[in-house]
């Protein structure tokens, strides 16, 4: 699963670069409504009305961002499909790729933007199906667990033990 780890790391960098651009693009609109707010501070979020008042491109960018997030999941699923021979391997590969991508994403945001300030800094975690917010630590824990579960599944399968999507069946 080295390919999943390498893909996850590279994709994490790519996503962090895109978010760097998005933050630079959105910052003037945020400053319009929240002057003096530090650039790394994401909250409070702009309302739809504020985004529309900031210019016609702002709501369009939000729609593009939701599409980017959907494409991210499709890409992670597709790369897992490319290396898997069965549904269990697909789930394991997806978990490894997703977890690696998410952790790499936050690591590269720290390198590129010096953000987050800590693992307890709140973030917009995902926009689909509705905005999810929480401390950065939450997706890091979930992602580390996904990587561990995926690796355990593959190890058990390689030993010839019967597994069902990460559950060992003795």
Model-derived features with residue positions:
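Hydrophobic cores of alpha-helical transmembrane segments in multi-pass inner/ER membrane proteins
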Residues: 72-79, 134-152
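Membrane-helix exit/interface motif
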Residues: 72-86, 108-115, 152
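Small-residue packing motifs within transmembrane alpha-helices
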Residues: 4, 8, 12, 95, ...
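Alpha-helical membrane segments in multi-pass integral membrane proteins
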Residues: 138-146, 161-170
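Glycine- and acidic-residue-rich phosphate-binding/metal-coordinating active-site segment common to enzymes
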Residues: 112-140, 144
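Transmembrane alpha-helix/helix-exit interface in multi-pass inner-membrane proteins
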Residues: 12-24, 99-117
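Extracytosolic (periplasmic/ER-lumenal) interhelical loops and adjacent juxtamembrane/interface segments
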Residues: 20-62, 66, 118-131
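Interfacial segments of alpha-helical transmembrane regions
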Residues: 1-7, 83-100, 159-169
């Amino acid at each position: 699963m080295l390919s999943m780890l390498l893909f996850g790391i590279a994709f994490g960098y790519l996503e962090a670069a895109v978010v760097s651009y998005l933050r630079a693009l959105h910052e003037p609109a945020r400053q319009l409504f929240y002057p003096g707010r530090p650039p790394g501070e994401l909250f409070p979020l702009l309302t739809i009305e504020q985004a529309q008042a900031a210019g016609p491109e702002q709501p369009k960018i939000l729609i593009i961002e939701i599409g980017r997030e959907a494409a991210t999941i499709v890409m992670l699923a597709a790369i897992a499909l490319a290396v898997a021979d069965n549904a269990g391997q697909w789930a394991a590969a997806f978990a490894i790729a997703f977890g690696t991508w998410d952790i790499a994403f936050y690591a590269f945001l720290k390198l590129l933007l010096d953000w987050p300030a800590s693992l307890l800094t709140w973030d917009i975690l995902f926009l689909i199906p509705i905005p999810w917010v929480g401390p950065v630590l939450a997706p890091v824990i979930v992602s580390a667990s996904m990587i561990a579960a995926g690796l355990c599944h593959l190890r058990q399968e390689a030993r010839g033990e019967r597994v069902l999507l990460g559950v060992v069946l003795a």
